[in-house]
Swiss-Prot record:
This is AN1-type zinc finger protein. GO terms for cellular component: cytoplasm. PROSITE patterns: ZF_AN1 (PS51039). It comes from the Eukaryota. Zn(2+) 3 binds at residues 100, 103, 121, 124. Zn(2+) 2 binds at residues 29, 32, 46, 48. It holds the Pfam family zf-AN1. The keyword Metal-binding applies. InterPro entries: AN1-like_Znf (IPR035896), Znf_AN1 (IPR000058). The keyword Repeat applies. Disulfide bonds: none annotated. Zn(2+) 4 binds at residues 113, 116, 130, 132. It comes from Dictyostelium discoideum.
Length: 165
């Protein structure tokens, strides 16, 4: 039946193979990131390989992606870091995405000069600070197609039309 197949796309099946219960609001384990049903949401219920550190635990920060990783009790930081790197350490995301047109600095906000229309950092945002050279707009005649120019000239040369008002 088509409706049954559509419902499979809405929820997520419990990660426990013997359970495989379809859950519309699954629980995500903070340790292993698996998705589980209500019965298997606890770390001990699904035998979590990387349980989250509760009281008295520590964390370690990955130097490459700056992720904070929990270190379970009776585990070593170096083992957690090496496992994190093996799983595929995500690239560090940068907030600063707008490059200054005058220097190599990046900014988190876009600062566009109204005169030259280039992007700049806070230090070079004023025209005098980035040696602004305004963009020259081409004359209107150059931007209009020849066909449109012909129509405009015909309109200019035509006699006004009288209307009854």
């Amino acid at each position: 039946m088509q409706v049954d197949r559509d419902l499979d796309k809405v929820g997520v099946h419990c990660a426990i193979k013997d359970c495989n219960l379809l859950d519309f609001l699954p629980f995500i384990c903070q340790g292993c990131q698996g998705q589980f049903c209500l019965e298997h949401k606890e770390e001990k219920e699904h035998k979590c390989p990387t349980p989250i550190v509760k009281i008295g635990g520590t964390t370690v920060t990955c130097d490459k992606c700056e992720s904070i990783l929990p270190v379970p009790v009776n585990c070593f930081e170096k083992d957690i870091l090496s496992m994190h790197l093996r799983k595929g350490c995500p690239k560090k995301t940068t907030v600063n995405q707008h490059k200054c047109s005058f220097c190599p600095k990046m900014e988190s906000i876009k600062i566009v000069c109204p005169n030259c229309k280039n992007n700049f950092c806070i230090k070079h945002r004023f025209e005098r600070d980035h040696k602004c050279k305004p963009r020259v707009n081409p004359p209107l005649q150059q931007t209009i197609s020849p066909h449109l120019q012909n129509l405009l000239s015909q309109l200019r040369n035509s006699k006004p039309v009288k209307t009854n008002s």
